[in-house]
Every structure is written in C-alpha cells, then in structure tokens.
Design a protein with these regions (language model features):
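Residue-level signal for mature regions of secreted extracellular proteins and peptides
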Residues: 3, 27-28, 41-42, 106, ...
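Sec/Tat signal peptide C-region and signal peptidase I cleavage site
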Residues: 13-17
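A short, surface-exposed beta-strand/turn
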Residues: 78-84, 137-150
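Acidic, glycine-rich flexible loop segments
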Residues: 88-139
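Bacterial N-terminal signal peptides
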Residues: 2-9
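An ectodomain-focused feature that recognizes extracytoplasmic/extracellular
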Residues: 18-89
C-alpha cells in the first residue's frame, strides 16, 4: 500500500472521505516524466509511470494525479488560486493504493502548485508544501509536449 510505503505517519491530519469534492467537470491525461515525487526523505520518483492526470471540479478544486507503479496514485489537490491563473493552493494529498477494497488516504497539506497549458507544448507541473509541521512534500512533472488525452 502506498500509504504504508510512504510511512508518513500523519493520521492526525487525515480528512474524512465525505469531504471529497463531487462534480468532476474535466479530466486530462498527459505523458512525460516525473521530475520529483517525495515526502520527507522518501523519494518516490523512480516509481512514477510517466503519466499525469489533471482533474478539475465544479467547486474550483484541481487535482494532479501522479500515476505510480502497481496502480498507486499520488494526488496533490487544492483550490484554484484567485490571485494567479496557473496556480493551485494545495490543501490535501491523496494516497491511493489502487485496490478497490481500500479507501484512498486523504492527508491535510499546505502548499501550492503551478502549471502551464498542456495544449501549448511542453509544460511543467510543480507542487511543494508541508504535511503538518514536519513533513515536506514535492511533486513535479514535465510533459513530453504531445497534446493531452481527454
């Protein structure tokens, strides 16, 4: 399980599943490479598959889904910034082990993501922040420049 693999130990910051945003309005998949995916000292970059999902919800929430081996997904999620059109204010990380029998683990976070337009060629998603006071996280992905699939 990805949550165990990460050994984050942040059960105090877990957000209830009923707080998950409804109303998906858009989902794109882009190809490229993970530049970095890590929590604290756990570097997960080598487990990335080269695919990134980008989800947009009706309430302004955006999720960047870093696809990992063994069907695991590392998601950085937050509300679209009102000050910057290409930024997201991160408020949670979602760890999904890919098994239908297990619910994803949602962990409160603080940070931000910036991104470019995937329809205009190569672009980079860069996310960074903290889980609680002690755990840093970083997640970045560079697309290969091909148009996204919807």
């Amino acid at each position: 399980m990805l949550a165990t693999m990460l050994a984050v130990g942040c059960s105090a910051w877990v957000i209830r599943a009923e707080e998950t945003p409804p109303n998906l309005v858009g989902l794109l998949t882009v190809r490229g490479q993970c530049l970095k995916v890590s929590i604290a000292r756990d570097d997960l970059t080598g487990r990335c598959t080269g695919e990134l999902g980008m989800a947009v919800y009706a309430d302004g929430r955006t999720g960047f889904h870093f696809m990992m081996r063994s069907r695991h997904i590392f998601t950085v999620s937050g509300i679209h910034s009102k000050q910057q059109s290409n930024a997201v204010q991160v408020d949670r990380i979602v760890l999904n082990d890919g098994l239908e029998t297990n619910k994803p683990e949602v962990i409160a976070a603080e940070g931000s993501c910036t991104y470019g337009d995937p329809y205009r060629g190569r672009m980079t998603v860069r996310c960074a922040g903290k889980l609680g006071r002690l755990q840093d996280f970083v997640a970045s992905f560079e697309t290969d420049g091909t148009p996204p699939t919807e």
